[in-house]
């Protein structure tokens, strides 16, 4: 299982929180102090909490669990998509649509529409339409791909959420809470840790920090999946004997 050291976190700037005037008092247990009116996160808390989260994500993925990566702010968007693709998982990296989890039935219909449009764009259907109709469908396809492309093959609700910025993604966290889906989240000094099952106190803005978290999670999920495949192979080998 991938682990992250304190040195890695220091180099990535994980310890830099937000300005002291924007703090959430619920984050006090994870704050070391302040420097130049910026809160400093206590990495002696972050390191074990992150590694505990990785261990749990490894267990979930080794049971074929589906992990949904969520990070819709611009700084995290591309990194979230890359990490999810790296470990064959799922992502929402533009806008969280209200009801994405709690109203899955409706979302599923939109995903079906997205897949239908994808087929139409490839099988020549668009070519038979008027220019205006083809343009309208092309725009609809792009819009659906933008919002649902990362979950179109999820095939049902995820088994866990990994969230960059608990404050920014509070709607996603609330929906997961309502459905009993465990939430793993990077929680900065300005955020509310309530509703997060596995709190990872850390900088949620610096791209180096965000890339560090996502890289470790993707590697852990890949390893967890390979454990699952290895145990399946072992079982089939025993059966064959």
Swiss-Prot record:
Domain of life: Bacteria
Any single Gene Ontology cellular-component annotation: cytosolic small ribosomal subunit
GO MF annotations in UniProt: structural constituent of ribosome
Transmembrane residue ranges: none
Keyword annotations of the record: Ribonucleoprotein, Ribosomal protein
Pfam families listed in its UniProt record: Ribosomal_S2 (PF00318)
Name used for this protein in its record: Small ribosomal subunit protein uS2
Species in which this protein is naturally found: Enterobacter sp. (strain 638)
């Amino acid at each position: 299982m991938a682990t992250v050291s304190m040195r890695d976190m220091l180099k990535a700037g994980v310890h830099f929180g937000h300005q002291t005037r924007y703090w959430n008092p619920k984050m006090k247990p994870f704050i070391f102090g302040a420097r130049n009116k910026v809160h400093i996160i206590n990495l002696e808390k972050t390191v074990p909490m992150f590694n505990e989260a990785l261990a749990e994500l490894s267990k979930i993925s080794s049971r074929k669990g589906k992990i949904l990566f969520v990070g819709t702010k611009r700084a995290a968007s591309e990194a979230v998509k890359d990490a999810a693709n790296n470990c064959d998982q799922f992502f929402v990296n533009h806008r969280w649509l209200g009801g994405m989890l709690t109203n899955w039935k409706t979302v599923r219909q939109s995903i079906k529409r997205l897949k239908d449009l994808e087929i139409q764009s490839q099988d020549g259907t668009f070519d038979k339409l008027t220019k205006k109709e083809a343009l309208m469908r092309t725009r609809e396809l792009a819009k659906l791909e933008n919002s649902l492309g990362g979950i179109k093959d999820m095939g049902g609700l995820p088994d866990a959420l990994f969230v960059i910025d608990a404050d920014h993604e509070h709607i996603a966290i609330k929906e997961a809470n309502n459905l009993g889906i465990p939430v793993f989240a990077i929680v900065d000094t300005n955020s509310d840790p309530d509703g997060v099952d596995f709190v990872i106190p850390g900088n949620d803005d610096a791209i180096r920090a965000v890339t560090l978290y996502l890289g470790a999670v993707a590697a852990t999920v890949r390893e967890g999946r390979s454990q699952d495949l290895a145990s399946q192979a072992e079982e089939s080998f025993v059966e064959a004997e």
